[in-house]
A protein has these predicted regions:
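Alpha-helical transmembrane segments of multi-pass membrane proteins, especially transporters
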Residues: 102, 106, 132, 136, ...
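Alpha-helical transmembrane segments of polytopic integral membrane proteins
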Residues: 67-70, 74, 113, 117, ...
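Hydrophobic alpha-helical segments characteristic of transmembrane helices
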Residues: 77-154
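Multi-pass alpha-helical transmembrane bundle typical of ion/small-solute transporters
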Residues: 39, 44-50, 60, 67-86, ...
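Juxtamembrane "helix exit" motif at the C-terminal ends of alpha-helical transmembrane segments
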Residues: 73-77, 105-128, 203-225, 234, ...
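Divalent-cation
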Residues: 1-82
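Polar-ligand-bearing catalytic/cofactor-coordination segments
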Residues: 1-15, 19, 23, 84, ...
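Juxtamembrane/disordered regions of integral membrane proteins
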Residues: 29, 83, 97, 131, ...
Length: 301
C-alpha cells in the first residue's frame, strides 16, 4: 500500500505520496481543478539523509515546501475570475518567494512556541533547572492549545478545517481498503495518528526532555538553544509519529491520545462535496504513484 499524507488548502486538499503530490480545488465555478507535480526528494538520492532523526528534519522541510506550493496554487484558483486561463492558476511561487514564506513561517513558530515560553519562564522566580524546564514546557503547550482554540473560532478557517477533516477521512478509508466514494469515506474518523497537529505536540513534549540536559541557561543561551536544537527535536518527534503510524495498537494510541485529542480543534465534519475534492486529490496521487518505481522515501503526514 502506498504511503500517503496531505494537508488542507484553500477550498481544497493536497495529497502526497513518496514520489508525487496533487492538489484538488473546488473553483468558484463549482468544478474541481487538480494540479499534479513530481517530488524530487534528496532522501531518495542520499542514503545518509534517510538515517533516523535526520530523515525527520528532511521530511519536515519537504512537507513545508510542498505545502506552500499547494497553498499558492489553491489561492490562485480561489481568486481566479470566470473565463480566466486555467494555466494562470497553476503558476507557483518563485524559489525566492518560497524561501521567504518558509522563513516567515518558521520564524513565527519559533518566536511564539519556543522563544516566548522560555522568556516568560526566565522572568519567573525559579531557581531549579528541572522545574524551569517543566514550567517552560507547560507554558509552551498552553500557548499552543490556546492558539489552536482561538484560530478554530475564526469563521474563515472553518472550511479549511472541514477540508482537513476530509483529508483525514479519505486517507483513513484508503488505508482501510475501502472504496473511495464520498458516502463511504464519510463514515471514517476525523482523526489520524500521523497528523501534523500531533507531530507539533510531540515536538513540545520531547523538547522538555532535551532541554532538561541544559537546565536553566542565561537568557541569550536559552534563545540560542531553543533555535539550534529545533531540528534535533523535530527529528525525534518524527520518529515517534512514524512509529505510531506503523503500530496502531491500544498502548500506542493511549500514549498518543493528547495529540489525537488536539485534532478535534483543527478538523471539522466535511460535506460530501468536500470529500469529493479530497478523494480526487488522493486518486490523482495514487494513479501517479502506481506508474512510479518503488520509493525509499516515507511520508510524514
Amino acid at each position: 500500500m502506498t504511503n500517503v499524507g496531505g494537508q488542507a488548502v484553500l477550498e481544497g486538499v493536497m495529497m502526497r505520496s513518496p514520489g508525487n503530490w496533487a492538489v484538488a480545488v473546488r473553483t468558484p465555478a463549482g468544478v474541481i481543478a487538480q494540479v499534479t507535480r513530481p517530488i524530487e526528494s534528496r532522501m531518495a538520492r542520499h542514503r545518509w539523509l534517510r538515517l533516523p532523526v535526520v530523515r525527520g528534519v528532511m521530511a519536515l522541510g519537504e512537507s513545508l515546501a510542498i505545502g506552500f506550493r499547494a497553498l499558492a496554487i489553491s489561492a490562485n484558483y480561489a481568486a481566479q475570475e470566470e473565463g480566466a486561463d486555467p494555466a494562470e492558476a497553476e503558476k507557483e511561487l518563485s524559489r525566492g518567494a518560497l524561501v521567504f514564506a518558509f522563513l516567515i513561517a518558521i520564524g513565527f513558530a519559533v518566536a511564539l512556541f519556543k522563544v516566548t515560553p522560555g522568556l516568560i519562564t526566565e522572568a519567573l522566580p525559579i531557581k531549579s533547572g528541572g522545574w524551569f524546564v517543566i514550567v517552560e514546557g507547560l507554558i509552551r503547550v498552553t500557548i499552543f492549545v490556546l492558539y489552536l482554540s482561538l484560530i478554530s473560532l475564526l469563521p474563515d478557517l472553518r472550511r479549511v478545517f472541514q477540508y482537513h477533516g476530509a483529508e483525514h477521512k479519505a486517507i483513513n478509508a484508503y488505508e482501510a481498503g475501502e472504496e473511495l466514494k464520498p458516502e463511504t469515506v464519510q463514515r471514517f474518523s476525523l482523526i489520524h495518528p500521523r497528523c501534523g497537529t500531533a507531530f507539533l505536540l510531540w515536538v513540545m513534549v520531547i523538547a522538555v526532555f532535551v532541554f532538561a540536559f541544559f537546565g536553566r541557561p542565561s537568557w541569550y543561551w536559552l534563545i540560542a538553544e531553543r533555535i539550534l536544537l529545533l531540528p534535533v527535536i523535530a527529528g525525534l518527534a518524527y520518529e515517534v509519529i512514524r512509529f505510531a503510524g506503523k503500530h496502531q495498537n491500544r498502548v500506542v494510541m493511549t500514549i498518543l491520545a493528547p495529540g489525537l485529542w488536539l485534532q478535534r480543534l483543527t478538523t471539522r465534519e466535511p460535506s460530501l462535496d468536500q470529500l469529493e475534492v479530497s478523494i480526487r486529490a488522493l486518486q490523482e496521487v495514487l494513479e501517479l504513484e502506481s506508474k512510479s518505481g518503488e520509493s525509499l522515501v516515507e511520508v510524514m503526514a
